[in-house]
Amino acid sequence: MRNDISLELASRLTEQVKTAFENGSLLDAVTPVTQDLLKFWFMGPYTEERSKNFHEGQKQSILNIIYLHEVLQVTTVEEIYRQVAPDLLAECNLSDLAKEKYRIPKYAVKMATGTGKTWVMHALLLWQLLNARHEEQEERSGRYTQNFLIVAPGLIVYDRLKDAYCGRLKENCTERDPFTNDLYLHKDLFIPPAYRDEVFSFIQNNVVTKEEGIGRKITGNGLIALTNWHLFLSDEEKENMDSDSAPSIIRDLLPITPGLSGGNVLEALDRKYLRGSELDYLSELSDLMVINDEAHHIHENKKQGEIEEVEWQKGLNKIAHNKGGHFIQIDFSATPYDTVGSGKKKMKCYFPHIISDFDLSQAMKSGLVKTLLLDRRQELTDLANLDYNALRDERKKVIGLSDGQRLMLRAGLRKLQILEEGFIKLDSKKRPKMMVICEDTNVTPFVESFLKEEGLAEKDVLRIDSNAKGEVKEKDWMQVKERLFNIDKYESPKVIVSVLMLREGFDVNNICVIVPLRSTQSAILLEQTVGRGLRLMWREPEYSEEKRENRLQVLVKKKAPKSYIDMLSIIEHPAFLDFYNDLMNEELAGIDEGDLPDGSNVTGDIIKVGLKDNYQDYDLFWPLIIKEQEEEIHPSEIDINRLAPFTDFSYEQLKEILAKPGESFISYAVFCLKK
């Protein structure tokens, strides 16, 4: 059995769908509502008249799911294989596909970090919502729904979901502005004008957050429920999440808490009592679409073949039970696989329901993410035998940083300084940042202290500590999230120090240097760590040509970069050599063996030229041609009832003028004499 068979499935499906969309057969087979959406999203003149459009990876993911669900009308993962590529079933784990969790319409979207999977999520939600609302009541197919559950893996992604559907927080306020949600901000991309009022009304009235309580807030016909994975935790796991803290011990001893904190108010007691009823409420819905963001958290594989379901998946199984084809699950992840084995036998086992694959290679070559650079400095290669783990005493307590770790941090700071000096000459608003990933929270204070010893101020370092599962306590999170989410806007902080917390949802653009002090061998953790810095920093069109030439220089010609514009530098860690070699072999990374000669070369050949002092005296403008003028000729029909009467001659006169019987006509030949 192949462990990557679903990638082959995704490739074959994509070819089928491309052909069907290009020849028009896909449009002919879908509902009128879906036709409206697909034309608005992917066809002219709409795509020519706006500045933002879906890129090819987003488009293909949307089309593939619509094709499977609406055209082929699959009801299980096995059915996807049977209808798209039946020969691949011989290489599948059929006992795996027979599990309850795959006996539903279930689709996994594999998209590289930073390539906009949230936009795909929005589009698919709109497709389901509008079809459900416009289906004839007596002819309902059961394949569309107005009920949605969107699940995040942690606090960062959950906050991003609230931004996307509830709107961003107002300045210095806990209130959200509904006119800043994604669908309103980008309505010209997502929603055809005829559907906008009903979509905006639905979003405003039917979004339910975990704080409001799923099943407690009264909504109209349908809901968009936002939550994170804690919804699916068992009571035992909830108790164990922070079991070593004093407050949790007190909660165990005194579940009804006296005092001044409001622990006994009715709302608080209701929340505790109703916690389990959220799953019951979702289970009782007649239909539902579940969207899992960062879905690699759902699976747990200790061998090639799952041993035990994680609580997240158990909860989904309960919700899906008895819904059959009225339950749809869409999983999004840049890394939809489990890692099995160890050492040379380590391999990736991809989820069996992957239906689209827009990988890092495609994203990088398309210029949708930064280009990776392995910072292989002379001092690092010469001292490869240094210890790169934190110093610990005989009781394994961390007592300091090793020489190798100090060396890596200095290399990262040096690169950050070079970028700061070069970028500010071109654009003072471009502020590069560095991220340090530590092995555990006992190391982060030593890293913070060392960075300050190297000259950084208190405000320049933001330390975020999390527990073993990568979670920050909610009260701590409230203190750091404002600084964290606005990090692109301000000069400080310059360096973010974390353990697991920032693996997902950290959607900032200015991370230009990553120092991976954490020596984990997990492929998923490595890819997720690298993914934190992939989002583009220099998005303006004037930099496109410079970036294209740089990608060619680094990825194809295997030479040093000419500039650092939209380059992500990873300070090389000896424990990750295999991972780095894989990146190099797949043409996903280049090597930077030293600093550019001086800061002026950081931005390559681009120079900043100011305006003339009297530029306002020049009345210049550049017309934007949206559509060339064309004469449209329409055939017209003559309505005899609307013709004016003919009065120039009488009826008798006309009879005299007309030819009489027996008249003959004589033809004359005309000659042209030539000199």
Feature roles, as predicted:
Residues 116:
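Conserved glycine(s) of the Walker
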Residues 498, 502-519, 524-530:
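A short beta-strand element within the Helicase C-terminal
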Residues 26-110, 119-120:
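Conserved pre-motif I regulatory segment
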Residues 656-669, 674:
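Residue-level detector of conserved catalytic or cofactor/ligand-binding positions
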Residues 97, 102-108, 146, 431-434, ...:
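Pre-Walker A (Motif I) flank of P-loop NTPase domains
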Residues 113:
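The conserved Walker
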Residues 122, 126-159:
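Conserved SF1/SF2 helicase motif Ia
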Residues 1-7, 11, 131-137, 159-163, ...:
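Helicase-associated low-complexity regulatory tails and linkers flanking the ATPase motor
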